[in-house]
UniProtKB/Swiss-Prot annotation:
It is found in: Nucleus; Chromosome. It comes from the Eukaryota. Keywords: Chromosome, Developmental protein, Differentiation, DNA condensation, DNA-binding, Nucleosome core, Nucleus, Spermatogenesis. Testis. Transmembrane segments: none annotated. Residues 1-34 are annotated as: Disordered. It comes from Dicentrarchus labrax. This is Protamine. GO terms for molecular function: DNA binding. GO terms for biological process: cell differentiation; chromosome condensation; spermatogenesis. The keyword Nucleus applies. One of its GO terms (cellular component) is nucleus. Protamines substitute for histones in the chromatin of sperm during the haploid phase of spermatogenesis. They compact sperm DNA into a highly condensed, stable and inactive complex. The keyword Nucleus applies.
Amino acid sequence: PRRRRQASRPVRRRRRTRRSTAERRRRRVVRRRR
């Protein structure tokens, strides 16, 4: 179970990074549209 917990931790970090990029792109579009 120790290896599975470690693998789940990095996976969450990678997903957060992808969400950060999508949130930044959406914020730019809202600024450009406004």
